[in-house]
Amino acid sequence: METKKKDKRVLINVLNIFFSILAIVVFMLYTRVEFLHMKELGLEYEKIYNINLKEKIYIMSITFVITFIYILCVNLFLKKDFKKLFKQENKEMPKINLFTPALLIGVLNSIVANFVFRGKILNLLHTAKFGKTVGILGLDYSFSLLISPIIQLLLFYITVFVILTIGYAFIYYILVVNFKLDGIDNNDFIKGNFVKLFRRLGIFLAYLTLIIYVLRTFDIYSGDMLKKQQPDNTYLTGAGLGDVTIKLWGRVILIFYFLITIIRLNKDIKKQEGIKVVKKVISIPVLLLSLQVILLLFNNVIIRQNRLEKENKFIEKNIKATEEAFNIKLDTKVISEAQELVKKDIIEAQEVIETVPIISKNIAKQNLESFKKKDSPYKYMNTSVINTEEGTKYFTSREINDTKKRTIEDKTYVFNHGIFGALTDSAHVDEDGFILFDEKMNNDKFTLGNKVIKQPRIYYGLNTNKTTVVGKDILEYDYEITSKETKEKEIFTNKYDGKSGLKLGKFDAFLLSLTKLDFNIFNEGQNKDNKVLFNREIIKRVKTVIPDITYDDKPYIVPNEKGGLTWVIDGYTWTSYYPYSQRIQIRDENGNLRRINYLKNSIKVLVDAYDGTVQFYILDETDPFAKQIQNKYPNIFKTEKDMPNIIKENLLYPRKLYDVQARIVENYHKIGADTLYRSEDIWEISSVKNENNKIIDTRYLNIKLENEEKPKLSLLTMYTPFSKQNINGYLIGSIVNGKNKLTLYKFDQNESLLSLNLMRDKIHEDEKAKIELDKISRMGTEVVRDTMLVPISTSILYVEPVYQIHLNENSVPVLKMVIVANGSKVGIGSSLKDAVSNLFSDTAININIYDPNDMNFLLEKIINGNKNLKESLNSKNWKYIGKDVDKLTKLIDELEKAKAKDDMRKNRENIDKIQSNRENENHELKVKKEKENTINSIFDRIFKPEDSNARK
């Protein structure tokens, strides 16, 4: 029997040692793979690996030691209880292995802790200051945004671990008591060490919860502050009067109460005073609920009468913080009145009109797919826009299609890179309406953005997921040319001579082939003349270096100074807890919905498409989130000044940032606290849906800004007042001197420039326009319409290209017509030039742009203005009384003007109706007279006596 027990102990010890060694080996192998990934990126990134490795060792070793000692103490604590129980039953206590559970749990916990806290401890040690303070303690924003979340995560992790420990101890205790003993008496159980352990850990958890509650107090400043008035009804973010008085100081009082309660609770439990314990536990949720009730009464009763005045400074904080957090630095231009375009405006804007993208990116890509050969080894990826000497072009990168069914050998050695791409003219088509594009596949000169491309190959891209082996003896598929005469294919090959890739030894080759599940790496990767290229998908590649940054999922290609291709990836920093900044809902890089209130494009990453070289640039050194990463990894980042000029010249305003900023500007466009709270000047983005019921994306247009010699590629968004259809402003996002710039144009008055949706509907309701559109709507075809608004002078030109696509296998989009409109005039032509010419000719179609909702819109604003004035009068707020009277007077003046114009329109319609009736009457009289003359003529021929001379 003793021998069996001894053998069992030996087996347990052997297994213990085995699993410990296995854990160490797995850790070392995993670490080696990480090292290979960093080594492949370059020498400077090995420093990042070393920094991360130190952090990992610290996290895992400290976690292991603490966990091991902690579990060992728990086991020893329980063992004392077991000794007592076995002694009471006169049984020999079996030997309990204290070290094995402690060792295994220690190893497991250290691995989990590494994954949870990886990178976060470094963040904690390299915090950057915001230079702004918040709260009664006057702490820098960095505490609540950078430090507190990590501390809370640590406390939450400890809390979960302690709860699991209690579960572990309980199961351990129950198993021993039920399987080794004959149960346990209740009194013995209550007086036993397990209950003591449970009590101590419970009190410890209470203290942890209290600390988390203290830290969560800072979240008050990024909570829901107060609800805006109709029609918006959204909550402003921040801390209002009730929050900084009742809620904040109420929490401070509760914190001290909870601290005293926990101390006294511990004493009451020791004394086994159950009633007191229950009372103290129940008092906590009761007090929390009471605080919420008091806050509700304060907000809805005490300050309801004069809420705007009392909340004014907090709303102003919200406005300021929102503009800071989303980098909304608006250069605002006011256009006194929108004017209809004249020929002079068109002539002066010729440079802009010639580059209007009548071809969308989707149409351009669809066209390329139509012409692509079925057996093509390539796949078209991202389409981006770039200015060239010939005009604005779309560049669609052409990468290897690694999803095609090929042998593993072909994927590893032969089909491993893409080559250049296709350039599509965005503003012109040929005389038959076919899209103009240039798809180079040979050794001709490749040109992109006025730069000759000497190295057009793409080894690192968006679809380069496979690991590949390259070398001087390995011939890779490059491109093929089919002879026009013989129809035979000539295949050209390439040998990679870039600096990227690793020469691997047997061990590293085996390890990498194991992780990539590709044993060709092991077979050929260890050849001294070969190199292994891996981690080639560019988003994953940059995440390998710095995963803290959120990367744009739509990078674009630009030419570099060496005559190669470079990917530009926009990097973003964000948070949901920036004090007072307004929250907005977006989709993150994984497609999940998030509510954020801070977003900056502070980082750009350049990745060489040929050799995979990665370079990080920090563009906004005032962003503490970016500065924290820079502090963590010194010498990795370069500044905007270090960026090559050719890259700067081709940078685009980040669409993801712009789309968020455009939504923020709907409410935050240089307005006051009263306007924001009362929702008096809410805008809506003027968007339109395509045939698939999807909103058409914002697009890059060439727009000429003030004080700029040439038009710049810019993003454009049009706005209408909430629930109204007239354009009242537009936002331009452009790159000026290498920096993002937002320019907002506001119309003081505009009745002739309609939103995209309304203008589209008005045009398509017109009979003449319908006839033209019906001509191309045939059976077996699909009509695709695209729409955009182009700012010209003090007006806006509506442009709608119309494509016809035959519903067959090779469906090529063909431009059939272009519709343009401005004010009440519509021009239709086979091209943009013809359509603009017809807009100012006799063939122009006149449409009715009157919107019957205009009067109702003004009446609603007057009613709301009167309501606001009454509130100001009741609260005797003279500041807002004056403002409200001025606003109401202005609205009444606008109503009078609108009424006068409406009366003129009605009079004109009546006059036109009278003239039309008269014309109809005259026409009827004329027809009647002609009929009478015809009848008389026939009668005369039949019955009038014949002339005597005629008879003769």
Model region roles, listed by residue range:
Residues 919-952:
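Long, low-complexity, intrinsically disordered segments
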Residues 3-875, 879-923, 938-942:
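Soluble extracytoplasmic regions of secretory-pathway and membrane proteins
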